[in-house]
Amino acid sequence: MALLSDLINLDLSGRTGKIIAEYIWVGGSGMDVRSKARTLSGPVDDPSKLPKWNFDGSSTGQAPGDDSEVILCPRAIFRDPFRKGQNILVMCDCYEPNGEPIPSNKRHGAAKIFSHPDVKAEEPWFGIEQEYTLLQKDTKWPLGWPLAYPGPQGPYYCAAGADKSYGRDIVDCAYKACLYAGIDISGINGEVMPGQWEFQVAPAVGVSAGDQLWVARYILERITEIAGVVVSFDPKPIPGDWNGAGAHTNYSTKSMRSDGGYEVIKKAIGKLGLRHREHIAAYGDGNERPLTGRHETADINTFVWGVPNRGASVRVGRDTEKEGKGYFEDRRPASNMDPYVVTCLIAETTMLWEPSHSNGDGKGAAAP
């Protein structure tokens, strides 16, 4: 008799030319990832050739019960590390039946910014450092922690050993699964707080950064589901003298990566400072809890940048300063930020927005 594991790993390629496409979308909370699968007649490698689909938005907080149909539009395709073969993961965004984006569809606005000719010409690169915390399912307490608290921070960052590193098997599985899927995941590391980890998606261009980070989050959610562990993107899961969790966003444009780029970087950082409040408002919920000026953060109410200051709002690396070109790191985004929102706002502020007397208070103005 076949075991459940045998059927999960069943290879369909020798029996049918059909494939399974898992359609993924961002749910109504802005942080939940939802998905459902459908059968296609054969392999597809172009999202424009995939059929649109729909779902019950009243069950995800995205539509009322008396008009609940929400349309899924495929935007990006990834290899499916769970079903393997020709099966695919499909990142989608969501629309009303009349074609208007629903309020929780942040990709639509990001795609408009990234399709602007001035932005496209600069080829914006992003590298997002996604931090997260692994929690025990029954207690919602960090993985590996005793019922009370472990020893203070210090031994856990990038550590090895059963008394210092918790959940590495989950993290490594997610790492390999993302590579298999075709995500530009560039690394992983254990974080300062035990049970907390980080992966990096980099470099990714334009709206693709958001697509890739959301699918990486989905893969991580699926793997923790299998492991019976909860993944938390709360920016400060444990109060007190423990590091929070962020999504530091590294950024460069073609001009920044070229000779003389350091001056372009400094001008861009100046613009970010003028719109500090607007960026903070868009950089994730609960960000006031980690951004205290402690634990490698800047105070939420203050904008400061420096080389190579990890207590700054924006950090410039030594290599960038030395070479006179490169990238910078925005250290303000929380771990629960929406990558579509953060990446397009950074691009808009640094490339499309210009300060004026009427908006010099830092609130800024909408880009064209």
Swiss-Prot record:
PROSITE patterns: GLNA_1 (PS00180), GLNA_ATP (PS00181), GS_BETA_GRASP (PS51986), GS_CATALYTIC (PS51987). Gene3D superfamilies: Glutamine synthetase, N-terminal domain (3.10.20.70), Glutamine synthetase/guanido kinase, catalytic domain (3.30.590.10). InterPro entries: Gln_synt_N, Gln_synt_N_sf, Gln_synth/guanido_kin_cat_dom, Gln_synth_cat_dom, Gln_synth_gly_rich_site, Gln_synth_N_conserv_site, Glutamine_Synthetase. Residues 106-368 form the GS catalytic domain. Its EC number is 6.3.1.2. Its main location: cytoplasm. GO terms for biological process: glutamine biosynthetic process. Keywords: ATP-binding, Cytoplasm, Ligase, Nucleotide-binding. SMART domains: Gln-synt_C. It holds the Pfam family Gln-synt_N. It catalyses: L-glutamate + NH4(+) + ATP = L-glutamine + ADP + phosphate + H(+). Residues 19-99 form the GS beta-grasp domain. It comes from the Eukaryota. GO terms for molecular function: ATP binding; glutamine synthetase activity. It is an enzyme of class 6 (ligase). Transmembrane segments: none annotated. Found mainly in the vascular tissues of seedling roots. GO terms for cellular component: cytoplasm. Residues 38-66 are annotated as: Disordered. It is found in: Cytoplasm. Disulfide bonds: none annotated. Plays a role in the flow of nitrogen into nitrogenous organic compounds. Homooctamer. Belongs to the glutamine synthetase family. This is Glutamine synthetase root isozyme 2. It comes from Zea mays (Maize).
